[in-house]
Structures are given as C-alpha cells and as structure tokens.
Regions:
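Exposed loop/turn and edge beta-strand positions of beta-sandwich/beta-sheet ligand-binding modules
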Residues: 17, 28, 40, 61, ...
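Cysteine-rich, disulfide-stabilized extracellular repeat modules
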Residues: 5, 17, 27-30, 49, ...
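Structural motif
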Residues: 17-22, 61-66, 108-114
Length: 117
C-alpha cells in the first residue's frame, strides 16, 4: 500500500513460512523489514502522519489487528481476538488518525470501528 504522501510503499515479504511488513521508498532503494514475529503480517493502510502502518497479523494461530511505526519499529496489538476460526482484515485509518475500521468475522464478515486511545 502507498503512504498517503506517496513517498513509501508497504508490502509483505515472505521469509520461509512467515510474511513480514516491509517498506521501501516509492522512488526505489533498499527495503526495510519492520516485523520479525513468526506468522503472517499483511499491511493495509498508513496513518495520516505516514508513520504507522495498520496490518492484519496471524500469530500463534490467531488473527488480530496491529500497527507498526516505520520510524521506530514500535508495534502495538490493537485487538485481542482468541477464536481459532475467526479472521480480521482490511484495517483502514480514518482521516483524523483516531479510529481504525476493519473486518472481523467468525463466519460472515462484519465491519468494526475501533477508537484508538
């Protein structure tokens, strides 16, 4: 996904059985892997300040929503789902940066809006 200012791209890169959030300058150049945890990390959208990337992460057999900072690599888990057959995807920041909307489903898709504190 493109950063809002168009200067960076975020994408997942496969390393063995794992997929990690990775960024690179849109004009080309070296890539920077941001996540290191085992599992899947699927980046989807940038925060309004173009520093954080919201992504769906599959870790320890569970899907949750996270963000990670491009500049510091600080990471935060935003949801705490614990059902094995559920999934989350498509996290998108609102223009103010105060909320994230995403899909959560145990069997049929539902749209959730989360306030960030």
């Amino acid at each position: 996904c493109w950063s809002r200012d168009g200067k960076f791209l975020a994408f997942e890169i496969k390393r063995g059985a794992n997929q990690h959030v990775t960024v690179m300058p849109a004009a080309g150049g070296p890539t920077t892997q941001l996540t290191t945890e085992r599992g899947l990390s699927w980046p989807y959208s940038w925060s309004p300040d173009d520093d954080k990337i919201a992504f769906a992460g599959y870790r320890n057999d569970l899907w949750n929503i996270y963000w990670i900072s491009r500049s510091t690599k600080e990471q935060k888990q935003l949801t705490n789902y614990n059902k094995l057959n559920a999934f989350v995807r498509y996290p998108e920041w609102d223009p103010s940066g105060k909320r994230i909307i995403y899909e959560y489903s145990e069997s049929v898709g539902n749209i959730w809006l989360m306030d960030l504190k």
